[in-house]
């Protein structure tokens, strides 16, 4: 909660007439900190008082696994976001949403069955099944939209129907990029393909209007000169679309991931204090800067 000028407190989330903010975190390349960014942002905003729904749209289900589930066992046949998206007898999204061990943070899990959505969508397009893939997630979210301030979607690392379904339900995008030549080349390819696909969809269904599109420099090592040069190159081209604060590369994040934890869950006594402080400042800095973008989408002034 925040404190007003007269000492009153108020929550930072939606107010009357504010739209639900649906944010897809995307990249074309695996290992670009998509899932790491998604779970840390979701947890940070839940801790800040936002009502958050995390949606795992990746059949690999890394985000679901990070919340302590074993998708290959617990969601082998049902109980995932696929159940709400499938073309034959879909269920309401509310039926598959799980509470997590974080207050204010719920999860719509994924599982391997979600990969079926790609082939089913191709079939549905041929046979003109309604609603089309362009609307399916948006319609599913609409059922529960009053329950949340933010939806954070972890997308798969390819530009298929699953990713496009997420992008078309979104109000804003966050693209993660590791500042290396290969990763930047991959991102450029992703953006070119996404642009062409979106243009085709707009010709068929009308304009797609996101509130914002931001880039997050991830797994950044400030002492790595080529990385610093590449980060500077990205900022020179993309300007203020690149978040000022990068997500640093840290052993604390990788160590936490080994036990399906985030840095917010680590036992401070198990980590070098300087290391933990450094990565907390980085992750919180990213989240707080991106929070300003969200607040601006609601038409609010930010610091």
What are the residue ranges of the model-derived segments?
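P-loop NTP-binding core
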Residues: 1-303
């Amino acid at each position: 909660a925040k404190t007003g000028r007269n000492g009153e407190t108020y929550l930072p989330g939606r107010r009357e007439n504010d739209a639900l903010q649906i944010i897809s975190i995307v990249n074309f390349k695996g290992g670009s900190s998509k899932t790491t960014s998604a779970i840390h942002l979701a947890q940070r905003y839940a801790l800040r008082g936002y009502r958050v729904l995390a949606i795992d749209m990746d059949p690999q289900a890394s985000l679901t696994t990070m919340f302590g589930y074993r998708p290959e066992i617990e969601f082998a046949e049902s109980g995932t976001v696929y159940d709400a998206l499938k073309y034959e007898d879909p269920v309401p999204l509310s039926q598959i949403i799980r509470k997590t061990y974080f207050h204010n943070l719920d999860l719509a899990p994924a599982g391997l069955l979600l990969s079926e959505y790609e082939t089913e969508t191709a079939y549905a397009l041929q046979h003109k099944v309604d609603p089309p893939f362009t609307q399916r997630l948006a319609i599913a979210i609409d059922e529960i939209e009053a329950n949340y301030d933010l939806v954070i979607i972890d997308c798969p690392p390819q530009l298929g129907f699953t990713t496009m379904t997420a992008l078309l339900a979104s109000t804003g995008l966050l693209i993660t990029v590791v500042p290396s030549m290969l990763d930047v080349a991959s991102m450029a390819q992703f953006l070119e393909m996404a642009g062409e696909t979106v243009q085709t969809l707009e010709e068929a269904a009308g304009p797609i209007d996101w509130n914002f599109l931001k880039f997050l420099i991830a797994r950044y090592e400030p002492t790595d000169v080529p990385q610093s040069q590449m980060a500077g190159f990205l900022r020179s081209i993309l300007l203020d679309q690149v978040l000022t604060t990068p997500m640093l590369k840290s052993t604390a994040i990788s160590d936490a991931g080994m036990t399906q934890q985030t840095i917010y869950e680590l036992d401070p006594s198990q980590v070098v204090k300087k290391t933990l402080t450094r990565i907390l400042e980085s992750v919180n800095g990213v989240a707080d800067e991106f929070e300003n973008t969200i607040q601006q989408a609601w038409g609010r002034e930010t610091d």
